């Protein structure tokens, strides 16, 4: 069987689903490759993480007996079969990322935030779904994709697995700052951490003291490795957005502005995102009102 794969997003991050499908079919003896419109396939998989706002699917497949599409970008759908979900990913599918392992130790989140699909898709409890050995086999770096690791009752044992690996770990999706404790930070301090991500999504919830406490307890020395997603254009005012950005910087964190439904965002929010996320500008222009595009509009 010839199997074609399509990464609809084509962004700078490997598609974990496609890597698992590639490994599964390769083990079955199937021929697996990136889809080529000039060839004929028995089966083609299209996978998309992002919705039309950020990643439009314009790819028409007319050269396959069967086409299966899936991923959060297409809306609710079936999960991967157990034997595929828990297979070690084929990291050779993305050669430029070799040396890095990608996966989930836990799934689900109790927060049920309106802008996030995780609670509806994975459940409102964070549960352990794998051990590290399922997707890591000595790679130098681990990209952990758990939506709310600290909400998982087994999170301490899972963190211990990361410690034992001695790999460089990037907590990519955001640890819950509200669940930080002296005990779990003590464990996190033993992880070889490349970066830790948090989120300050709700402007009506003042998380200042939580961030201050983590800063006092953590062994991560560089503010550029203590990163915080700041959600905007989801019921917040510009003043609330700017307050969170400035507060995080003052506390020793590196904010990163995320815009909900970017096409509907006001111009000032898009300017804020460019100012904050372009770190060369952010570190050289300390006040948003001094950012050049804003000065032109005053």
Give names to the regions the model predicted.
Residues 26, 163, 246-250:
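Anion (oxyanion) recognition and catalysis
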Residues 5, 10, 45-49, 117-214, ...:
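Core AdoMet radical
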Residues 1-69, 75:
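A short, structured N-terminal alpha-helical element that caps or precedes a catalytic domain
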Residues 21, 56-63, 158, 183-187, ...:
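A general structural detector for well-ordered alpha-helical segments in enzyme core domains, enriched
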Residues 65-93:
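Ser/Thr/Gly-rich flexible loops in soluble cytosolic domains mediating phosphotransfer, phosphorylation
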């Amino acid at each position: 069987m010839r199997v074609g794969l399509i990464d609809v997003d084509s962004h700078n991050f490997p598609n974990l689903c496609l890597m698992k499908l590639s490994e599964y079919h390769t083990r079955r003896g199937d021929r697996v490759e990136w889809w080529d419109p000039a060839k004929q396939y028995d089966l083609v998989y299209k996978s998309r993480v992002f919705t039309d706002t950020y990643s439009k699917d314009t790819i028409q497949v007319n050269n396959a007996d069967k086409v299966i599409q899936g991923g959060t970008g297409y809306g609710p759908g079936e999960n991967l079969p157990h034997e595929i979900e828990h297979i070690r990913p084929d990291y050779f599918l993305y050669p430029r990322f070799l040396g890095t392992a990608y996966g989930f130790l836990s799934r689900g989140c109790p927060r049920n935030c309106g802008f996030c699909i995780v609670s509806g898709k994975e459940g409102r409890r964070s549960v352990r779904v794998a051990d590290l050995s399922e997707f890591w086999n000595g790679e130098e770096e681990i990209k952990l994709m758990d939506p709310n690791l600290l909400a998982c009752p087994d999170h301490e044992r899972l963190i211990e697995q990361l410690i034992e690996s001695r790999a460089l770990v990037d907590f990519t999706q955001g640890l819950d700052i509200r669940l930080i404790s002296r005990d779990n930070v003590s464990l996190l301090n033993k992880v070889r951490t490349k970066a830790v991500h948090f989120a300050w999504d709700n402007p009506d919830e003042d998380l200042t003291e939580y961030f201050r406490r983590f800063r006092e307890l953590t062994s991560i020395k560089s503010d550029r490795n203590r990163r915080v997603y700041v959600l905007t254009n989801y019921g917040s005012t510009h003043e609330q957005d700017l307050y969170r950005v400035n507060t995080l910087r003052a506390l020793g964190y590196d904010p990163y502005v995320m815009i909900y439904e970017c096409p509907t965002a006001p111009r000032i929010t898009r300017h804020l995102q460019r100012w904050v996320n372009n770190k060369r500008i952010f570190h050289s222009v300390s006040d948003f009102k001094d950012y050049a595009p804003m000065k032109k509009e005053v």
